[in-house]
Amino acid sequence: MNIEEAKQRIEQLTETINYHNKLYYTDDNPEIEDYEYDKLFRELENLEREFPELKKDDSPTNKVGGTILEKFEKFEHPIAMYSLSNVMNEEEFLEFDNRMQKELNQSKIKYTVENKFDGLALELIYEKGKLTVASTRGDGQVGENVTNNVKMMSNVPKSIKEKKKLIVRGEALITKKDFEALNKEREELEEIPFANARNAASGGLRQLDSAESKKRRLKFFAYQIANYKDFDLTNEYKSMEFLSELGFTVEGVHPNIDAKKVLETYYDIQEKRSKMDYEIDGLVIKVDDVKHQEKLGFLSRAPRFAVAFKFKPEEKETVLKNIEVQVGRTGALTPVAKLEPVQVGGVTVSNVTLHNPNEIKSKDIRIGDTVVVIRSGDVIPKITRVVLEKRTADSKPFEFPKKCPVCGGDTAVTDGDVIVRCINEECPSKITRYIEYFVSKPAMNMERIGKEWIAVFTKSGLVKTPADLYKITRDDLFKFERMGEKLAGYMLESIENSKNTTLKRFIYALGIRQVGETTADLLAKYFTSIENFKKATIDDLQNIEGIGEISAKSIYDFLHNEKTLKLIDDLLASGVNPVFEKVVTVESPLTGKNVVITGSIEGFTRNSAKEAAERLGATVQSAVSKNTNILIVGEKAGSKLKKAQDLGVEIMEADEFIKLANG
């Protein structure tokens, strides 16, 4: 691979990994299996190692976790929270062990092994024996303050006998038993069951109502003391013992073992994990001696003295009863395997997406086959292969429909002969899925209009395009059964409120293929108005950093389609007013500088301080790096100050920043 090819591949991998990071860490809605994500991440690491001049400071390999939700107060961690590098097999673990031996000049390394819980990382801070702050990991530097919700967790000590400041790290999760009970309750209330325990745990911690959070039955499992230097703790196991003595739940710790014993422990727990009361997706292997840890230090996103040794996905056999082909908003025909329900990794699996006809053909999947199902990373189920020796003599290859299974319309193959799409613009399924997308939270945010009512509206013919939503009257709504005065009022209010929206949301809501939230934001910033956007040329689009050739063509084609242009005009005529949220900049000492803000600044929230810095012409970064020009320091500045001083970064005091911000 030459340098130009490497550059293109790195850009593709970066965009893909950032997309999946957002789904996993922020939206709690992963689309791909852990092992598929790990393959992408490993490929990016290898390319950046081979072509170091192409590595950017904002590469996913330098980042920890995801973005912070705006609804929560931000909390800056006193000590950075890191992620872990992965090893995927015995060979990679032994490579790690050999590296530790060489770097520590030791013939045998002692490790502490702990369960790698499949939940949400938390930090708990105790001062004078009282729990004062609990926060999520966030991006590793700044997390979300979820103290009130954490105090609702039954096994979190609200007070401890230790009076020194103590920073405890651990994982919030839901046990398998509680997860099953939680989903049973949701089904009884006719609510959609949670896909997995991690999503339920993460969503529970991010509830604004602590009473709702309490209903999730979250538990906290401690695994680290971040400020261990303040205590007489010489190894990992002593830290775990100390936490246990203080009343924290500590599970699955195997202390002071060598590499051979690590492997024995790994295979033993991998075999037994399905019988555990909680989900784990691997083991965490840490060099036991803290002096050795300090000598080894950290990489940009992970410690050098520890790795996550991931388990192989759990596999189960079951029978494929049917293949149903569903139609999405872009007309994509997606085959879904209907299975004899099977327990895999503590979850009942009855449906598995087969993605496209090629997957069915390449694996020769047939109705009636016995298939092997995995849940990689204990999240998303997937069929890996057919058990051919159990196939019946009368089985026949699956014939993918040549017509749309919903409307009977013609189909066409696109996207490199992979995706089959219904090309009938009047297809009921396409219309329904499109309206669902249009009203969704990241789009026009019509929170009072649910999927059930959208199906009713589209089936009746009341709504055929998104613009029809803005024509709905109270009389229209009262024609439907179960429609009351209160619900009708809520719906109409939700529709009316959506008219005042941002340009980014509006562009996203249009449903242009290849345009997600990030691309919509890039387009809004570049064009600044819907009228400018409508006039976009292919050159304009390709000039935008972050938008590739395929995305540019898709956007251009959308804007040169009479029907979609009419939709935009109809929406604007209905009173929809997409406004670009422009950041006005003024010349200042911050203009053109990369700036990081740490600590609290009087008169500013973290978000308003960021906006003020941007108005002064700065690019605000989340973490200090060699590319940071200025660190703005408020009260209770965290670890960023020391790092900035070590790197020789210019320090600006809060008073000076306040004067600049206030003009």
Swiss-Prot record:
DNA ligase that catalyzes the formation of phosphodiester linkages between 5'-phosphoryl and 3'-hydroxyl groups in double-stranded DNA using NAD as a coenzyme and as the energy source for the reaction. It is essential for DNA replication and repair of damaged DNA. Its EC number is 6.5.1.2. One of its GO terms (cellular component) is cytosol. Residues 585-663 form the BRCT domain. The lineage of its organism: Bacteria, Pseudomonadati, Spirochaetota, Spirochaetia, Brachyspirales. NAD(+) binds at D34, Y35, E36, Y37, D38, S83, L84, E114, R137, E171, K286, K310. This is DNA ligase. Zn(2+) binds at C404, C407, C422, C427. Belongs to the NAD-dependent DNA ligase family. LigA subfamily. One of its GO terms (molecular function) is metal ion binding. PROSITE patterns: BRCT, DNA_LIGASE_N1, DNA_LIGASE_N2. The active site is at K116. It catalyses: NAD(+) + (deoxyribonucleotide)n-3'-hydroxyl + 5'-phospho-(deoxyribonucleotide)m = (deoxyribonucleotide)n+m + AMP + beta-nicotinamide D-nucleotide. It comes from Brachyspira hyodysenteriae (strain ATCC 49526 / WA1). Pfam families: BRCT (PF00533), DNA_ligase_aden (PF01653), DNA_ligase_OB (PF03120), HHH_2 (PF12826), Nlig-Ia (PF22745). Its cofactor is Mg(2+); Mn(2+). Keywords: DNA damage, DNA repair, DNA replication, Ligase, Magnesium, Manganese, Metal-binding, NAD, Zinc. CDD domains: BRCT_DNA_ligase_like (cd17748), LIGANc (cd00114). GO terms for biological process: DNA repair; DNA replication. HAMAP family: DNA_ligase_A. Signal peptide: none annotated. PANTHER family: CHROMOSOME TRANSMISSION FIDELITY FACTOR 18 (PTHR23389), DNA LIGASE (PTHR23389:SF9).
